[in-house]
């Protein structure tokens, strides 16, 4: 009997599409991290520390611009695909609208960067590196990860991502040898990604029989307008999650910034976990909520408490191993970094507490609630983190970032009870039946 239960449990676990989605999303993130770790010493050796810094600075600008290119479609796209995955005509219009809209935003972002460089003479130290980096905007625009998320078929996109990163690594080895070739680093990354993405779009067209229509301008405008709140929400969330180091830079020394930055980077890698949970389960959650509230509640409850258990384990493990992790990465004993990491180790756990709220927002397509919660959070995070950083430095900022995760839980729970009381009450009332 026990063998039968165990076999059923583990067999069902790995056959579950949401679990597969999660595994493949983690594979994508892991491959990105591994390739970054491999490429860093190669680039530093080839283009020097200064060139490496300018390449990363350009990449930071592109990452911010990619928020505009994504325009919230990475959140809304999977939902639309999940709801219409059996209607190829509807899918064709969804894919066409999203791809063309993102390409349009990439063109506008590129125009903005060109004007900033040649019209306003900004980014003086790395203008040409940044200009050659704009290909990454079109790589982002054509990446159909949202489509495969909605279909809950992530295997192909994860393999394609690994292959594009290997092409990038090969390009670095073959073509980047001197500091004056710095401008080609991000260009190679963008070209590899864009090339693989075009092959994926061809696969979608020919193998999955999805047609590409040329949308009318009014359709593109309507699509962008519909996603405007998600775009603004993403901006606020990005600042709230990633703005801590900038806040600390106003009050701390370079040494403190360096030690906090090391701990924060580790924390940010761990914080990917709750995001991956949300992205992997919400396409199926959307379909379940539309068809059967009871099944939705059971599914969400399992995912929610499962993610809490995993994140608790990861946080406690990181807390215990903090001295060894810092020693491994810095090659020296940085007691201050260890203190920061032990505090920030609980950021992913606190973030996981809000998974259920966010999934409900996304499943019900409540962009306004996402917008309100993210901007209320930003209005909380900035003064609190500024104040705590001013009085207590890195320790204060760590407390501020932890409180930010708890505050967003409170904000989203209140909004959920106001707008989705039926779903939230069903979720909590059914806990005892697990």
Regions found by a protein language model. Name each.
Residues 20-33, 58, 63, 71-117, ...:
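Membrane-water interface segments that mark the loop-to-transmembrane alpha-helix transition
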Residues 57, 134, 158-208, 377-380, ...:
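Hydrophobic alpha-helical transmembrane segments
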Residues 14, 19, 116-133, 320-352:
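Interfacial segments at transmembrane-helix termini and the short loops linking adjacent helices
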Residues 20-36, 157, 163-168, 183-204, ...:
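Transmembrane helical elements of multi-pass membrane transporters/channels
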Residues 15, 127, 137-160, 346-375:
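Membrane-interface junctions at transmembrane-helix termini in multi-pass inner-membrane proteins
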Residues 16-74, 169, 229-255, 382, ...:
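Signature of the first transmembrane helix
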Residues 70-86, 267-291, 360-363:
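Helix-loop junctions and terminal segments of transmembrane helices
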Residues 2-18, 182-186, 195-241, 284-298, ...:
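Interhelical loop/hinge segments that connect adjacent transmembrane helices in multipass membrane
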